């Protein structure tokens, strides 16, 4: 377990800053910079019975000699290690862990700029390796790290502008990058690449999407959004719509929804991009009721959540005929809003093309931009937990 001081930095006579205390139970000297080079500062705790405040006061005992610092918040707290070393797939999480992560995410929502909490990752470096395009995932991770006081190492397009373009193996890239950073966030075009990276690295690895495999942090923010918007996770009905064969977000989301009671999942997709059997088998073995349907209007009228996804052109290769056949079959528009429940929500991992019409955006049930914002808080929580613990 690591130890975190509850005492924030203070200023001596408005000039010199002394370091954070490692303990408040005894005196210890601290060397001061000019103009107090010949002095030392000693830390003494007040009796535990005294009311404590989150600051420190400095008393000059005389013009020369030691300066005594009285810490008005005594003691230390232990940070419990996070149960996971890496975040690779949805099946890693249980219900209790999800609840605890969401509690931390809610704390992240309240962090103010320039507060002590906004510096909890100061001194840490995050490396982002994105071999596929990203807007929300990459920027929200980088924003999360910086909002907690950390720094970011990045390459614009790891597939083209890293040594992968020269033929370097993923394992060699990971071994190199871990020497420069404290945590790696990686998106890759191959399913299973994140697991390979985690097996190679001696620092935490977060899967930011591995081809058609999984996207666990997206699923975390999705479930967090459902809980925030609907108010519950047990007893809900969710429609997963669109490209269910290639969409990694729906795969990870299905794994997480299976942790809750009395959940029903509807799969609505063109025949060529149906949900794969491994997810269906997992849901069945977990006791989750699921159903395939071709009628989005009927399903939407029953559901608390309509989770729309785009048909992924990049997964079809040269088969543009198959892509065009699948694209545009299921659209969320004003007509669909007309049959949806008043308290239901529409979600989308984004980016969208034409599968949600723009006139839906103004409806309060359109939750996808609120969903994207929640990604910041979930990723702040994960970075904090993986690097410093609970």
Curated annotation (Swiss-Prot):
Q: Which SUPFAM superfamilies match?
A: Aspartate/ornithine carbamoyltransferase
Which keywords has UniProt assigned to this entry? Allosteric enzyme, Chloroplast, Plastid, Pyrimidine biosynthesis, Transferase, Transit peptide
Q: What class of enzyme is it?
A: transferase
> Which InterPro entries does its entry note?
Asp/Orn_carbamoyltranf_P-bd, Asp/Orn_carbamoylTrfase, Asp/Orn_carbamoylTrfase_sf, Asp_carbamoyltransf, Asp_carbamoyltransf_Asp/Orn-bd
Recorded catalytic reaction(s): these are: carbamoyl phosphate + L-aspartate = N-carbamoyl-L-aspartate + phosphate + H(+)
Q: Which GO terms fall under molecular function for this chain's record?
A: amino acid binding; aspartate carbamoyltransferase activity
> What GO terms fall under cellular component here?
chloroplast; chloroplast stroma
- Where would you say this protein principally sits, based on its record? plastid
Which of this chain's residues are annotated to bind carbamoyl phosphate? 136-137, 187, 215, 218, 350-351
Fetch the PANTHER family from UniProt: ASPARTATE CARBAMOYLTRANSFERASE, ORNITHINE CARBAMOYLTRANSFERASE, MITOCHONDRIAL
Q: Which NCBIfam families match?
A: asp_carb_tr, PRK00856.1
Spell out the family assignment given in the record's similarity comment: Belongs to the aspartate/ornithine carbamoyltransferase superfamily. ATCase family.
Q: What is this protein called?
A: Aspartate carbamoyltransferase, chloroplastic
Native organism is Arabidopsis thaliana
């Amino acid at each position: 377990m690591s130890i975190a001081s509850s005492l924030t930095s203070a200023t001596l006579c408005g000039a010199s800053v002394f370091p954070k205390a490692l303990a408040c139970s005894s005196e210890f000297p601290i060397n001061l910079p000019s103009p107090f080079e010949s002095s030392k500062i000693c830390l003494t705790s007040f009796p535990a019975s005294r009311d404590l405040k989150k600051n420190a006061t400095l008393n000059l005992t005389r013009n020369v000699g030691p300066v005594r610092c009285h810490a008005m918040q005594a003691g230390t707290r232990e940070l419990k290690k996070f149960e996971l070393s890496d975040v690779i797939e949805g099946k890693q999480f249980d219900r209790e862990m999800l609840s605890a992560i969401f509690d931390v995410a809610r704390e992240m929502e309240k962090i103010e700029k320039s507060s002590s909490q906004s510096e909890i990752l100061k001194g840490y470096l995050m490396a982002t390796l994105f071999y596929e395009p990203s807007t929300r995932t990459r920027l929200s991770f980088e924003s999360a790290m910086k909002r907690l006081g950390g720094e970011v190492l990045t390459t614009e397009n790891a597939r083209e502008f890293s040594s992968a373009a020269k033929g370097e193996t993923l394992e060699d890239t990971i071994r190199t990058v871990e020497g420069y950073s404290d945590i790696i966030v990686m998106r890759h075009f191959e399913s299973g690449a994140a697991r390979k990276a985690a097996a190679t690295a001696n620092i935490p690895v977060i899967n930011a999407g591995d081809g058609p495999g999984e996207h666990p942090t997206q699923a975390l923010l999705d479930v967090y959004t459902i809980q925030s918007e609907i108010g519950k996770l047990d007893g809900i009905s969710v429609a997963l719509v669109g490209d269910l064969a290639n969409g990694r977000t729906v795969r990870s989301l299905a794994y997480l929804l299976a942790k809750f009671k009395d959940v029903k999942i509807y799969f609505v997709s063109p025949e060529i991009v149906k949900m794969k059997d491994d997810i269906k088998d997992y849901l069945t073995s977990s006791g989750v009721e699921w159903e395939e349907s071709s009628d989005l209007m009927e399903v939407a009228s029953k559901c608390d959540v309509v989770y729309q996804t785009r048909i992924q052109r990049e997964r079809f290769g040269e088969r543009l005929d198959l892509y065009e056949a699948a694209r545009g079959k299921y659209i969320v528009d004003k007509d669909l809003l007309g049959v949806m429940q008043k308290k239901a929500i529409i979600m989308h991992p984004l980016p969208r093309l034409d599968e949600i019409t723009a006139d839906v955006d103004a409806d309060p049930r359109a939750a996808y931009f609120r969903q994207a914002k929640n990604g910041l808080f979930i990723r702040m929580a994960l970075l904090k937990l993986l690097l410093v613990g609970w």
